[in-house]
Amino acid sequence: MKAVMQLGMRIRYLRNLRKWSQEDLALESNVNRNYICDLENGRRNPSLEILERIADAFGISLSELFLGVETIEGL
């Protein structure tokens, strides 16, 4: 599975843990809701700035956001 898909699944998992809608995460992170949707579905390759905003919204570090995500394709 591609890293971008794994990252999207991780973001969805963290959002669901908090019982947040995509709109809730969008408001907390100042990221467009459609972008959040695309990100969760592996259709976006987010910038570091976007990832930092999302991690901050969840109250976690950037490294925690990537837990369980393979960062090297093909492994």
What is each residue range found by the language model?
Residues 5, 16, 44-45:
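Short amphipathic helical patch at the helix-1/turn junction of helix-turn-helix
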Residues 9-28, 53:
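Short basic helix-loop element that most often maps to the first helix and adjoining turn
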Residues 11, 25-26, 36-39, 65:
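Conserved hydrophobic/aromatic packing and binding residues within compact polymer-binding modules
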Residues 30-45:
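Recognition helix of helix-turn-helix/homeodomain-like DNA-binding domains
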Residues 49-64:
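DNA major-groove recognition helix of helix-turn-helix/homeodomain DNA-binding modules
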Residues 56, 66-75:
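Short, charged recognition helix plus adjacent turn
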